[in-house]
Amino acid sequence: MNRCPITYELCGPRPYSLKGLRLLSPALKDLANLGLSAGELRVEAMARASKMSVQGVQPKLSAILNIKKGMFDIVDRNGRYILKPQHHIFPELPQNENLTMHLAATIGIRVPLNGLVYSKDNSLTYFIKRFDRRGQKEKIAVEDFAQLAGKDRDTKYNYSMEKLVRLVDDYCTFPSIEKVRLFNLVLFNFLVGNEDMHLKNYSVIVADGKVELSPAYDLLNTTIVLKEGAEEIALPLKEKKRNLTRNILVNYFGKETCGLTDKTIERSLAIIQAALPGWFTMIGISFLSEMMKDKYRKLLEERTRILFG
C-alpha cells in the first residue's frame, strides 16, 4: 500500500491521497510525475538560476500548478511553487526537508504548503508554495534578516542570535508575540539538528498591515547530512555555536534575551515534549531511507536529552 508524499497517510494503490491533492487544489484529480529526472531537473535549475528570485545551495526551480493537466509546469517568472530536486552531493535533502517541515507544523510553527512529488525517474522532488505571492501577480512584502541587518550572502553568518532578537524588537509590530515564535523555532531547530539557520533563513512579512515573522522555510536536519564536527547553530548564542545547553537555550535565550515569562517558556516546552512521541512515529513513516531515519532518530534522542534531561 502506498503512502502519500504530501500528507503521509496511506493511499492504497494511488501515488497521492485525495486529501493531499485537495491541499494543492480542490479541483485537482491527480498529479502526474514531473517530466524530468533528478539530473535533468538540476541541469534545468542551473540554466534558469539567474531568473530565479530565490537562490541558495540547493538547486531550485520555479513552477506553477497546471490543474487542467494535473502537473507542475516549470516557469521562469510568476511561479507559485518552488521545486527542489535531489542534490548531487548531499543525499535525500527533499525527503529531509519535507519531514522536518512536517515536524515543525505539529508544534504550531507556521509553514507553507509543502510536500514531495515524483519525478520522471521516480526520484522525489520537494515542493513548497511561495508565501510571498498572492493571486496571479501580486507580490507580498517580505524581507529577510540579512537585508534588515545590512548583510549579504557572503556575510549572512556574521551576526548573533542576540542581535537578531533586537531586529525583531525594531521591525515587528508586536515583538513580544514574535519573540515567542522565534524561541519556539530556535528550540525546534536545535532538536532536529538544523544548524544552518543563517540570516537569510529568517524573514519578516507584511500581513494584514502588521510586520511579523514569515512562515518558516528551509527547515531540515543538516547535521545528519554534513560530516562529523558540525556546529549546532548558525548564528552564535552566548558566543557559542556548539555545546549548547538547556540553560543557554531556555534561561539565557528564552528568558533573558527574549524576555519571555516562565509561564510562556513552560508552555512552549510542554508543547514540544508532548509532540515528541509523534515525531518519532513520523520519522518512521517518512520517505527517508532506513539509514537516514536511524540517523535522524539518534540525533533527536541526543538533543532531547540535552533539552529535557
Where in the sequence are the language-model features?
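Mobile late-domain/C-terminal helix-loop "cap" segments
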Residues: 238-301
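A short beta-strand motif that forms the metal-chelation/ATP-contact edge
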Residues: 125-130, 215, 277-281
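Conserved kinase catalytic-core segment
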Residues: 89-105, 160-224
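A residue-level signal for conserved active-site and pocket-lining positions in enzyme catalytic cores
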Residues: 63, 104, 145, 196, ...
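Conserved ATP-binding subdomain of kinase catalytic cores across diverse folds
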Residues: 39-158
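Catalytic-core segments of enzymes that bind and process phosphorylated/nucleotide-bearing substrates
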Residues: 144, 148-167, 206-263
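Regulatory N- and C-terminal appendages and interdomain linkers associated
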Residues: 1-41, 45-47, 210-211, 281-309
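ATP-dependent phospho-/nucleotidyl transfer catalytic cores
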Residues: 120, 127-191, 236, 251, ...
